[in-house]
Amino acid sequence: MLKFIDPTERWNVFTHALGVILGIGVSIYFFAQHSSEQPRVLIALGIYCFSLVFLFSASTTYHAVSGDIKLIWRKVDHIAILFLIAGTYTPVTLTLFYETSGVWILTGVWSIAAVGFIFKIFFTGRFEILSLIMYLGMGWFILLDAQTVWELFSTNAFIFLILGGSCYTIGVFFYRWKGYKEAHAIWHIWVLAGALSHAFMINEILLIN
């Protein structure tokens, strides 16, 4: 299949096709292991799992296609990033944070995602620094309630939280590195690492909740 794809995009397709497999595997695991959770938690998990598979599917498709449709899929790809960030927050805020700051954190990140959705419809490919600030701001939004994070997160969950956020943040360097043709594929690897770390974080939270 890869021989029909632009050679400059092959590694980009391959890395996030692995992400699709990862997302499906994580989804199967979560619903197999946590099927007895409350409906609220199962809905939150469904949103997270969908956002995970959606992100990697959109990215893989964007890098695989060519022609005019590529611009459409670029918009979908960027919107999927917003959706994954907010989707990752959803099971965290509706379980561990549910009786504290969960509602306002969840409302905040999904509100930013909604604004970002409109922004990306019209301005994908423009104002990239603003986009990165929006992504990173959403990602670290939880630290606005750092005290609750410190009090409620287990050691393992906290480690995976910071590890995942750090992977995404470090990956931005490669995303912005335009002079090295393989930099975007390396960015994809950092995204995979960040997504996997946050999947472990969510699992830890479900185990202690």
Segments from the language model and where they lie:
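Multi-pass alpha-helical transmembrane bundles in non-GPCR membrane proteins
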Residues: 1-209
